[in-house]
């Protein structure tokens, strides 16, 4: 029945219902004299409930338990917490327990902190446990050690004898009685955590077997009952916030989870497993051997599920396993079947296992990407730095499947645990294990560390106890068309001295079904047989791909129809000819093709080696067969004459060394039998170079145009002082805006500039109408290329002096005004180049500064009345004329880019002189109940009478090719409009707005300023 006052003591009402006579509830604390235990079936919280310093002891049962078989506690958005409490010591009790189903739902927060449970059932127990709809779930600094462990003396850690394995099965079942375990959750059927909104956190908890979860299998059949075994499950799904398991410690195995099926599904936040540890305090490792397949003690730094599966699927956030440790096997995970689909980034880093599998230990592993990337980095173990594929149970075959479907999978810096250690991405303990390595589209599966599969017939260092007479097949891209790459590129000089750091081995038959298998940068791959008639084999400098004798039923032959060359790896003086070999026959089929493979076509053809002729001794066919070991046919280069930027020329391929064409060392390469040579012939004797237009970098000289316009914006902000008749000291503060749209012109780039900032001005206005003032300001903004992915973020600092005076010319008042301005601007350019090969952007960055100046002298005079056609018009509309002389220009500093396709821009400059002329109109407005305002309108024509277009020299750093670059060729004729409005808001205060439009062919500039001033 639902929880009520009639069925429960007043003390528990204070805790579970926050008794408050209908007023707002507040957290309640239970004192040590509270009567326990409490029993119920349906419990509702009307307020926050806190259990603090509760002691259940050895005589009491669960603190909260079910009257019958099932218990439901509904939080109604309140908090339930246990702090500094001790649970019951009795075996079948916990803090909260139910005989069948336990449901905890709709809490604002469910929190257990600094509690101790010595009972077998831990803290929360039931055959089925469900936590759903909570705001957050927190288990922090709890201890769930089970006291019977103390019967094992510390001085003589004699482990219990392992249970004998069934004759028909060689499963990975543990050898320790299930009674000797302790976990926060103890379930027989399932634990499900779902729909948590803010976060799930298990931090710094301690236990024996599985600190957080221990699955207690109910095997009635095994005990004489008529039932069947029930596999417990641990599920975390549909959680919105972060899910984290950090610094949990298990003394015997499974740092977080021990036994049962584990599933993380459809969670939106990140999932983090960090710093979890599984020790082996019972000494199970010493009591068992790998041959028995019973060794789980100290296994699984995070999850130890030796008889079941672990799956991650549909999770939208990142997944991180780092700094987890296992005394046994599986630094993060030990399981029977492991499956992971990466919808976001997944990282296994710095995990360690003293035995096998620094990150993962399992006989069946299936890992794939679905929009995210997967990185295995700096994991360590005795066998398999990142992954150890263990032997499958009797009668079954292990499998390793890695699929980079939509996102890369990378193994880098994983090591064996001996010192100094060997690089090791994966160790496959059985030769019968099948291997499927796949990549789709532009995704890549990259092994910077080797993969080794046992080959007992070849004398492997650790032969498989159950070696199959027929090694498992190795398939490349059975379900993809991307790149599977083995490379030794990341090895340090000392690591390169140890050949095992770069050697991968598969004893079975290797088939390239699609896409490409890449072996490059000194990597070695040996297999039983090699067949590449559908997919491509791409080889790089120093690579070796060979079919070697060793396993039964292998004919150790190599047959290829599609070849590729990792071109960039051969363009260094330290290149080495690749080897394609076999202990049997090596065949390059008739009609074979060769692809020029390169990550960046632009970078390759920037290489100065292509100025002249070049020979590349690409690959040597090698066979140990006494006769007819090598069969070679002519090879056709695909897209040999494809258009490209950079140095121009053509390619050819032949099994005969060409004459008078040096290699990348500058030497004539040796004439070696069965070697395929590639030859480059330049289009001209002087190395014709074709520049990619997007690499011109016209934003650099155009920055002088932009800086000049910014100074003009600064000048327009002073318009209030030029038209004012006030007398006194005037201080003003302005907001400035600058918008310039420069259109593209044929193959010339345009730009779009947006800048905004402020201007502060101080000026003295004298009684004779003269003024003198100074101004300071800054503008911040960005200039974007109109044609390419390039932008320049700049900030400009400006300082100016200005003045005005009145002069009498032939009895007519003439206004003379002037200004000199200096600007210092800092520019940071970021350029992106879209790479057609990778379908990604390459990036480069640089920064430089400009020094700019602007000066003008102008006069406002009624010369329109001197001209008969304009006299009457000027009088009717009270128009006057003006004329100015303007000079603007600047210098840009040199700069060198960093990143991809780098360039060097030399110092540049640009200058412009113009003679604006036009008319001025004034209008005064007096609107009732509104302050008076004065409108000034300038219209005119601005011809540029002398110009040096901004320019500089751009140099390609890779080859020193220099190209003069000019800014946009602006039209020399422009029309402009200036509108200024002053609002007299106070006797000593003014508000004003100024707008200017400068329009010329293929460029439009808008300048806006507004502000306030104060007259003193």
Swiss-Prot record:
Database matches in PROSITE patterns: AUTOTRANSPORTER (PS51208)
Compartment(s): Secreted, Cell wall; Cell outer membrane
Coiled-coil zones: none
InterPro entries given in the database record: Autotransporte_beta (IPR005546), Autotransporte_beta_dom_sf (IPR036709), Polymorphic_membr_middle (IPR011427), POMP_repeat (IPR003368)
Presence of the UniProt keyword Manganese in the record: no
Signal peptide extent: 1-24
Membrane disposition: Peripheral membrane protein
Keywords: Cell outer membrane, Cell wall, Membrane, Secreted, Signal, Transmembrane, Transmembrane beta strand
Cellular component, GO annotation: cell outer membrane; extracellular region
Autotransporter domain residues: 697-1016
Family membership: Belongs to the PMP outer membrane protein family.
Protein name: Probable outer membrane protein PmpH
Chain's gene name: pmpH
């Amino acid at each position: 029945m639902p929880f009520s006052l009639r069925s429960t003591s007043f003390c528990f009402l204070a805790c579970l219902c926050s008794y408050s006579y209908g007023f707002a509830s507040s957290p309640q604390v239970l004192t040590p004299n509270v009567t326990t235990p409490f029993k119920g079936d349906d419990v509702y919280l009307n307020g926050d409930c806190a259990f603090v310093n509760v002691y259940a002891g050895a005589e009491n049962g669960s603190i909260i338990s079910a009257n019958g078989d099932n218990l439901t506690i509904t939080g109604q958005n309140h908090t339930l917490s246990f702090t500094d409490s001790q649970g019951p010591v009795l075996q079948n009790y916990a803090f909260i327990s139910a005989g069948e189903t336990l449901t905890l739902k709709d809490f604002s927060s469910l929190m257990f902190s600094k509690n101790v449970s010595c009972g077998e059932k831990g803290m929360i127990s039931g055959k089925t446990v469900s936590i759903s709809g909570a705001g957050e779930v927190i288990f922090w600094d709890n201890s769930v050690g089970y006291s019977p462990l103390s019967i094992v003396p510390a001085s003589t850690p004699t482990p219990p004898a392992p249970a004998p394995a069934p004759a028909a099965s060689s499963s990975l079942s543990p050898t320790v009685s299930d009674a000797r375990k302790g976990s926060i959750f103890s379930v027989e059927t399932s634990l499900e955590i779902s729909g948590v909104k803010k976060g799930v956190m298990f931090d710094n908890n301690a236990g024996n077997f599985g600190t957080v979860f221990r699955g207690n299998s109910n095997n009635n059949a095994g005990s004489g009952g008529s039932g069947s075994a029930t596999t417990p499950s641990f599920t975390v799904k549909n959680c919105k916030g972060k899910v984290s398991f950090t610094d949990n410690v298990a003394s015997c195995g499974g740092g977080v989870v021990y036994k049962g099926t584990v599933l993380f599904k459809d969670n939106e936040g990140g999932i983090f497993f960090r710093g979890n540890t599984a020790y082996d305090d019972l000494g199970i490792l010493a009591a068992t051997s790998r041959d028995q397949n019973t060794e789980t003690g100290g296994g699984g730094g995070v999850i130890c599920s030796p008889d079941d599966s672990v799956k991650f699927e549909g999770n939208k956030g990142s997944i991180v396993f780092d700094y987890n440790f296992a005394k046994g096997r599986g630094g993060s995970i030990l399981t029977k079947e492991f499956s992971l689909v990466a919808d976001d980034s997944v990282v296994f880093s710095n995990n360690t296992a003293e035995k096998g599998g620094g990150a993962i230990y399992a006989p069946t592993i299936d890992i794939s990407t679905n929009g995210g990337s997967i990185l295995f980095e700096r994991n360590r173990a005795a066998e398999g730095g990142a992954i150890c594929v263990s032997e499958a149970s009797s009668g079954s075959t292990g499998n390793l499947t890695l699929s980079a479907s939509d996102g890369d999978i990378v193994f880098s810096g994983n090591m064996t645990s001996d010192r100094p250690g060997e690089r090791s991405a994966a160790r496959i303990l059985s030769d019968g294990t099948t291997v499927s390595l796949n990549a789709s589209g532009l995704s890549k599966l990259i092994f910077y560390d080797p993969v080794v599969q046992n080959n007992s017939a070849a004398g492997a260092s650790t032969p498989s106890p159950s070696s199959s007479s027929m090694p498992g097949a190795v398939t490349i891209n059975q379900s993809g068309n991307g790149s599977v790459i083995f490379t030794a590129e990341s090895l340090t000089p000392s690591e390169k001295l140890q050949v095992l750091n770069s050697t991968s081995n598969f004893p079975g038959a290797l088939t390239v079904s699609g896409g490409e298998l890449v072996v490059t940068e000194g990597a070695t791959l040996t297999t039983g047989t090699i067949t590449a008639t559908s997919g491509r084999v791409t080889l790089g400098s120093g690579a070796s791909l060979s079919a070697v004798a060793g396993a039964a039923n292998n004919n150790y032959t190599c047959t290829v129809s599609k070849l590729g060359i990792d071109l960039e790896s051969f363009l260094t003086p330290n290149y080495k000819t690749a080897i394609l070999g076999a202990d049997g026959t090596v065949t390059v089929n008739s009609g074979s093709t060769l692809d020029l493979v390169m990550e960046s076509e632009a970078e390759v053809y920037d290489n100065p080696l292509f100025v002249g002729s070049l020979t590349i001794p690409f690959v040597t066919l090698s066979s140990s067969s006494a006769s007819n070991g090598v069969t070679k046919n002519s090879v056709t280069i695909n897209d040999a004459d494809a258009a490209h930027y950079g140095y121009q020329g053509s390619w050819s391929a032949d099994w005969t060394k060409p004459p008078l064409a040096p290699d990348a060392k500058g030497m004539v390469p040796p004439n070696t039998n069965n070697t395929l040579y590639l030859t480059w012939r330049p289009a001209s004797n002087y190395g014709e170079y074709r520049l990619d237009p997007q690499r011109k970098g016209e934003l650099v000289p155009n920055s002088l145009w932009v800086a000049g316009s910014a100074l003009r914006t600064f000048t327009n902000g002073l318009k209030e002082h030029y038209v004012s008749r006030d007398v006194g000291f005037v201080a003003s503060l302005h907001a400035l805006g600058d918008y310039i749209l420069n259109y593209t012109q044929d193959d010339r780039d345009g730009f779009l500039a947006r800048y905004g900032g402020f201007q502060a001005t101080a000026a003295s206005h004298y009684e004779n109408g003269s003024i003198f003032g100074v101004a300071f300001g800054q503008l911040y903004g960005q200039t974007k290329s109109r044609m390419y992915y390039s932008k320049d973020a700049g900030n400009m600092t400006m300082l100016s002096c200005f003045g005005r005076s009145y002069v009498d010319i032939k009895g007519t008042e003439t206004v003379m005004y002037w200004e000199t301005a200096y600007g210092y601007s800092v520019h940071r350019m970021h350029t992106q180049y879209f790479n057609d090969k990778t379908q990604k952007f390459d990036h480069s960055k640089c920064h430089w500064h400009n020094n700019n100046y602007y000066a003008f002298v102008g006069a406002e005079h009624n010369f329109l009345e001197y001209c008969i056609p304009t006299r009457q018009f000027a009088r009717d509309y009270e128009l006057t004329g003006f004329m100015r002389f303007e000079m603007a220009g600047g210098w840009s500093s040199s700069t060198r880019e960093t990143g991809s396709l780098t360039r060097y821009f030399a110092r540049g400059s640009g200058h412009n002189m113009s003679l604006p002329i036009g008319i001025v109109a004034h209008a005064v407005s007096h609107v009732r109940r509104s302050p008076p305002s004065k409108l000034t309108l300038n219209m005119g024509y601005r011809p540029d009478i002398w110009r040096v277009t901004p320019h500089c020299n751009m140099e390609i750093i890779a080859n020193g090719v220099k190209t003069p670059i000019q800014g946009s060729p602006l039209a020399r004729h422009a029309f402009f409009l200036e509108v200024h409005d002053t609002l007299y808001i106070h006797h000593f205060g003014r508000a004003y707005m100024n707008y200017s439009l400068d329009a010329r062919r293929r460029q439009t500039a808008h300048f806006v300023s507004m502000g306030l001033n104060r007259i003193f």
